[in-house]
Amino acid sequence: MWPVLIRERHDEDLPVCVDILRAVHEQASYPINWPTDPARWLTPEAALGIWVAVDAEQVVGHVILTAAGPAAEVERLFVDPKATGQGIGRQLLQHCVTTAAALDRDLSLEVVDNRGAAVHLYRRAGWLETGRTPIDWGGEHASELIRFTAP
């Protein structure tokens, strides 16, 4: 696929992002527990940047970079199920890597262990697994968080 446009998320993108998130949740159980207010969940206060991937003027992906003390974390990374397998997730991830480097912040992320495609993406992109933490909120879907740091 040709590179998609990665741009800041606009207010008018939020309903589409919620719709895509719902489709991801229904297909892949992400997030494991559906948020009470998905629009708010997609707009954390600690955000350093919120971006969408756009292809043919359609939002097809989403990612947030949040502050974590002096470091940064990748959060809320998802791609429209109709657009998976085209490298969009990797482009969004790379945008976060580039932005965190420009801000001189170390970068990490956490992913639940049921997200095989996401774990594969992070490993292929050179991210390093740095730990695992048991969780009690994953129900039958997941039992631990896997922590990765950017290369």
Give, region by region, the residue ranges found by the protein language model.
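Conserved active-site tyrosine of GNAT-family acetyltransferases
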Residues: 122, 127
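Structural preference for long, well-ordered alpha-helical segments within the folded cores
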Residues: 95, 120-121
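Acetyl-CoA-dependent GNAT
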Residues: 2-4, 8-82, 90-99, 135
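Conserved beta-strand-loop-alpha-helix junction that forms the acyl-donor binding cleft
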Residues: 84, 109-119, 135-142
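Conserved GNAT acetyl-CoA-binding A-motif
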Residues: 100-111
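Terminal substrate-recognition subdomain of acyl/acetyltransferases
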Residues: 144-151
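Glycine-rich phosphate-binding loop
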Residues: 87
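A secondary-structure capping/hinge motif
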Residues: 129-132
